[in-house]
């Protein structure tokens, strides 16, 4: 672009042209003192079209020859005013950020330019600088490749869009750079960071923007994010900041980020809430590296038994470009989805140590030595670690192949594949024994009980990996994958152990059944939690629920339930008042969970350290369910408007109470929750103990003193009341 030769102290005019055709532009001059330029260009394909002219206040006709404009860049048009020098391309800031999608554009400061495309086009443009009064609007009408721009106020709404193949302006890069500048400026003001460190901060912040994004209802472990950052600094040979400073960097980029402590009791960790890894981030494949092995607290030199995902051709190149698609085939799409889901599971979990084998006074079977026993222990440990690896990588279908390999099954797997180990060494580590010797060892009672205990530990670890927090939002695709996995477990095990004795299969199947049932229950609980979360966040629904609950006749409920539950009336009244108060405070789901946890602690505290703790816990569940059903019954009879909300809340609270009680019982007995829930899975082997528990329960319910008092009352009370109190013999037998 060149200056006008006639430029002087008098007001001058400058005209711009964006057409590439040879037709001379129609120039409407404007005084430069008004700081406005009106450009009208007509392409060769639009010769017959009418030119739309926009009224511009205070425009004067100044006869002056204007030289033809020279283009410095095919994608930008710049202008100069008066005696100003020509701006070199690339030194001005964009006034408008562009996106090929429909986008609302905000006006920025600085010199303005508009993208022009090759080919025929009609453009009518008025560019206004800051000198224009507030009532002087800037109007733009374009017809480029079918796009239409509507001017309203200072915002420009584009319908349609330019051809993607011809447009090269990146909105994301400009918005990212703006975010970086803003974040660095905030850090310099708040933390007093020197200006010479801005380039270092820029690399750290850019890495955060490239790999993370905001997402509602999602959390990420704080330690995992910092480990990712340390790895990045190590690869780029940068000096990392400490964890506290890194937290400030994150909050400077992702405004409003919250911190929560999530996880099960005794294993909770701090999480950033509202941020997640981008699906195309290379950090999703960290489990393939030694850093991932170190995060799992295993030796770096330990070999990986089963590779979670095979490296795809050209993936190394695609990792460096966020614009490229990560997966192009169905197999790669599944792999990418699994990697994305791993942020919702606990990938830092390790397999706890197994208990020692107690042979007692049982002699070893013939042809079995202690060397064989120790070899079985080692092989089974390797087998369980391999199981944990494939579940942690969400490769559920490999469980079937693992079982077939260990139990020497010759049956084909459900997907037609036959092998999974990576080498012959892996086969030897997993199998370890011929089938005949393996059957003999599994029939040996101490070995059978030891493997049962190992299975309880393994499957409890798998539950804590897949569902670390039952109340945390989880994608429905991951939940469905876990439920399908649970549905297939028993069939896979039965197929893999076809040639084994039934007593061995039943022992293994009982634990697997408890594991599958736990996965189904926890995923259902998680689904209920997400549905109830929306109800508890709705103020109008909460007010309606409180109004309906105040109409319930709790005195009548207590009178009907007291005969069955025999609960202390003061305890029931306290729970009623606490429930109403918590509902009135419009508590969140996490606050309700804390309230339920406190209720369980208060009720079961008198039984701590007692042998009757498991029975007291089960009785509490029955009584809680009975009372809640009585309240729901009253709401139903009254046609309460909030009945649906109460029904959903009741289902969630009953299920969460079940979850809390089973963990309390496991803690009191020193067992895993899987072992507690699998206690009655194999009824045939536990019938004697069941009879003993029934006898003790009957003795507790009808002690000698109770029976004597009951007989005394029966002599003095009317016959009608005796019918309500006396327990029939058939009921006592049951």
Curated annotation (Swiss-Prot):
Its main location: nucleus. PROSITE patterns: RFX_DBD. Disruption phenotype: Reduced cilia length in the Kupffer's vesicle and impaired left-right asymmetry. One of its GO terms (molecular function) is DNA-binding transcription factor activity. It is found in: Nucleus; Cytoplasm. Residues 1-31, 694-722 are annotated as: Disordered. One of its GO terms (cellular component) is cytoplasm. Coiled coil: none annotated. The keyword Iron-sulfur does not apply. It holds the Pfam family RFX1_trans_act. Residues 1-23 have a biased composition (Polar residues). Residues 204-279 bind DNA. Residues 706-722 have a biased composition (Basic and acidic residues). Disulfide bonds: none annotated. Keywords: Cilium biogenesis/degradation, Cytoplasm, DNA-binding, Nucleus, Transcription, Transcription regulation. One of its GO terms (biological process) is cilium assembly. Homodimer. Heterodimer; heterodimerizes with other rfx proteins. Belongs to the RFX family. PANTHER family: DNA-BINDING PROTEIN RFX2, RFX TRANSCRIPTION FACTOR FAMILY. Transcription factor that acts as a key regulator of ciliogenesis. Specifically regulates expression of genes required for cilium assembly and function. Recognizes and binds the X-box, a regulatory motif with DNA sequence 5'-GTNRCC(0-3N)RGYAAC-3' present on promoters. This is DNA-binding protein RFX2. It comes from Danio rerio (Zebrafish). The lineage of its organism: Eukaryota, Metazoa, Chordata, Craniata, Vertebrata.
């Amino acid at each position: 672009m060149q200056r006008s030769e006639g430029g002087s102290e008098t007001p001058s005019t400058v005209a711009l042209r964006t057409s590439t055709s040879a037709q001379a532009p129609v120039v409407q001059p404007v005084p430069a003192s008004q700081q406005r330029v009106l450009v009208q260009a007509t392409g060769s394909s639009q010769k017959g079209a009418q030119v739309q002219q926009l009224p511009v206040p205070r425009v004067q006709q100044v006869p002056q020859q204007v030289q033809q404009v020279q283009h410095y860049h095919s994608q930008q048009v710049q202008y100069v005013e008066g005696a100003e020098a020509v701006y070199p391309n690339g030194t001005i800031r964009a006034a408008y950020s562009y996106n090929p999608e429909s986008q609302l554009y905000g006006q920025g400061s600085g010199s303005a330019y508009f993208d022009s495309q090759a080919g025929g086009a009609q453009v009518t443009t008025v560019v206004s600088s800051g000198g224009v009064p507030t009532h002087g609007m800037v109007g733009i009408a374009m017809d480029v490749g079918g796009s239409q721009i509507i001017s309203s106020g200072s915002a420009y709404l584009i319908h349609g869009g330019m051809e993607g193949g011809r447009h090269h302006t990146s909105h994301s890069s400009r918005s990212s750079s703006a975010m970086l500048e803003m974040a660095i400026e905030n850090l310099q003001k708040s933390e007093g960071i020197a200006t010479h460190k801005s380039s270092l901060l820029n690399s750290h912040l850019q890495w955060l923007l490239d790999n993370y994004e905001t997402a509602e209802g999602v959390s990420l472990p704080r330690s995992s994010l910092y480990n990712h950052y340390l790895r990045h600094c190590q690869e780029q040979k940068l000096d990392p900041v400490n964890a506290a400073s890194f937290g400030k960097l994150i909050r400077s980029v992702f405004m409003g980020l919250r911190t929560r402590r999530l996880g099960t009791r005794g294993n909770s960790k701090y999480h950033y809430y509202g941020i997640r890894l981008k699906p195309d981030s290379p950090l999703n494949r960290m489990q393939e590296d030694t850093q991932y092995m170190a995060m799992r607290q295993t030796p770096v030199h330990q070999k990986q038994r089963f590779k979670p995902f095979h490296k795809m051709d050209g993936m190394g190149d695609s990792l460096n470009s966020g614009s490229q698609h990560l997966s192009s085939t169905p197999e790669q799409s599944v792999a990418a989805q699994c990697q994305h889901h791993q942020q919702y599971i606990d990938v830092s979990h390790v397999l706890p140590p197994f208990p020692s084998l107690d042979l007692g006074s049982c002699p070893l079977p013939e042809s079995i030595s202690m060397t064989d026993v120790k070899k079985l222990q080692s092989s089974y440990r390797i087998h369980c670690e391999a199981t944990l690896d494939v579940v942690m990588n969400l490769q559920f279908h490999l469980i079937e192949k693992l079982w077939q390999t260990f139990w020497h099954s010759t049956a084909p797997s459900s997907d037609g594949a036959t092998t999974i180990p990576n080498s012959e060494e892996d086969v030897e580590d997993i199998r370890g024994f011929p089938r005949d010797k393996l059957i003999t060892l599994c029939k040996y009672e101490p070995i059978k009980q030891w493997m049962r205990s190992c299975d309880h530990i393994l499957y409890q670890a798998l539950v804590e990996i897949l569902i670390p927090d039952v109340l945390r939002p989880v994608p429905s695709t991951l939940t469905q994958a876990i439920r399908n996995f649970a549905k297939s477990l028993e069939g896979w095990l039965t197929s893999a152990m076809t040639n084994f004795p039934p007593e061995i299969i039943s022992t293994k199947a009982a634990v697997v059944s408890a594991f599958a049932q736990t996965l189904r229950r926890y995923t259902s609980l998680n689904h209920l939690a997400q549905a109830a979360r929306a109800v508890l966040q709705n103020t109008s629904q909460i007010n309606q629920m409180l109004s309906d609950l105040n109409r319930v006749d709790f005195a009548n409920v207590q009178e009907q339930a007291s005969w069955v539950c025999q609960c202390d009336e003061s305890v029931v009244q306290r729970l009623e008042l606490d429930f109403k108060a918590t509902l009135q405070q419009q508590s969140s789901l996490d606050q309700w969970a804390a309230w339920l946890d406190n209720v369980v602690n208060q009720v079961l505290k008198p039984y701590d350290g007692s042998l009757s703790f498991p029975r007291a816990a089960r009785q509490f569940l029955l009584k809680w369910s009975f009372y809640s059903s009585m309240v729901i019954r009253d709401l139903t009879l009254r046609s309460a408007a909030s009945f649906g909300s109460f029904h959903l809340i009741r289902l969630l609270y009953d299920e969460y109470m079940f979850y809390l009680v089973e963990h309390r019982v496991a803690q009191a007995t020193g067992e895993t929750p899987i072992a507690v829930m699998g206690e009655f899975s194999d009824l045939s082997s536990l019938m004697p103990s069941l009879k003993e528990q029934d006898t003790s329960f009957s003795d507790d319910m009808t002690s000698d003193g109770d029976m004597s008092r009951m007989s005394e009352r029966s002599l003095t009370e009317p016959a009608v009341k005796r019918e309500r109190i006396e327990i029939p013999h058939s009921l006592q037998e049951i």
